[in-house]
């Protein structure tokens, strides 16, 4: 067994597959949370996902890999929304770290 396909060396999982799996994992880790997609056609650079949990929220910009390029305004909105609450770029290589940080933020 080689582990999840997106963790295999040399294989870059498509962003939409990683995002779909991530949404399921968020709902499992944070029971009762709402995970919804934000519309970058409305605000260019807005993060992909909004996570609502109890009285907290987080925004996650999903990338297929650590080296995937950032679109215009993404850095601005991730930083701005992180200052408001919690926002990060998330990709397979840092997923566990970001989800652990998110857990700490949601439980604080």
What are these regions (language model features)?
Residues 1-108:
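Catalytic phosphate/metal-binding cores of nucleic-acid and nucleotide-processing enzymes, i.e., regions
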